[in-house]
A protein has these predicted regions:
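Extracytoplasmic/lumenal domain signature
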Residues: 1-214
Length: 214
């Protein structure tokens, strides 16, 4: 299912939304979710097939955006170019720091460079979109697992990080926003799930979850 006009791909506790434009309009913008005030608008031509926004560097104090229709990454607050490696497909919490890594098909890379996982024998889905079968905090750390199909279509594989982190927060599936977006990841336009609170540089303790698992 592709949204015809705009699609809100990202939200933070501060209420910012990043919308990518499809079809003839192209590009994307970052705006206030409550007032619709536009922080950043980036123009582009043609359909903007993919787009993400997230803290992808441990040093980020503002998220960066990237889309397939507009080259390079920009700061969500100022629109200034940032030097991180461009990645517009998918995101995943994988290593020890609070920033997110870039996921594309069967591989995970750092925005600063370097491959963290290359899943030999597995493939992405949806043709050129090259999306994973699922990314979600399945095992209860707060980092996310990567579910991929084998290229032979005979099995699914679940990959998990082995990196040890000093960050201690509850499993992301206890956050109702994240939990709903994991379901949406499988039933709507396939994009990575996001928590309802900030994870990254300068993060505060997350709010106490109101979800209880028996």
């Amino acid at each position: 299912m592709a949204m015809p006009c705009t699609w809100a791909s990202w939200s933070l506790a501060m209420g910012s939304l990043c919308s990518r434009f499809t079809r003839s309009k192209g590009g994307y913008d970052v705006h206030d979710g409550a007032t619709c005030t536009t922080y950043v608008r980036v123009t582009g031509g043609g359909d903007n097939g993919r787009g993400v926004a997230e803290y992808v560097s441990p040093d980020d104090i503002t998220a960066a955006t990237c889309s397939s229709a507009v080259g390079g990454n920009v700061n969500c607050g100022t629109g200034a170019a940032v030097t991180h490696s461009a990645g517009s497909n998918f995101l995943i919490y994988w290593d020890a720091d609070e920033s997110r890594e870039l996921e594309n098909g069967p591989s995970i890379t750092k925005a600063s460079g370097g491959t963290l996982l290359s899943a030999t024998g597995c493939s992405g889905n949806n043709g050129t979109k090259n999306t994973p079968t699922l990314t979600a905090d399945l095992l209860g750390d707060w980092r996310e697992e990567l579910v991929l199909r084998e290229s032979s279509n005979t099995a699914l594989r679940v990959y998990t990080t082995t990196d040890v982190t000093t960050r201690r927060i509850y499993t992301l599936m206890h956050d109702p926003t994240y939990r709903a977006q994991v379901a949406f990841e499988q039933s709507g336009y396939n994009q990575p799930p996001h928590a309802g609170f900030h994870i990254g540089a300068g993060m505060a303790d997350p709010p106490k979850p109101d979800i209880h698992v028996k």
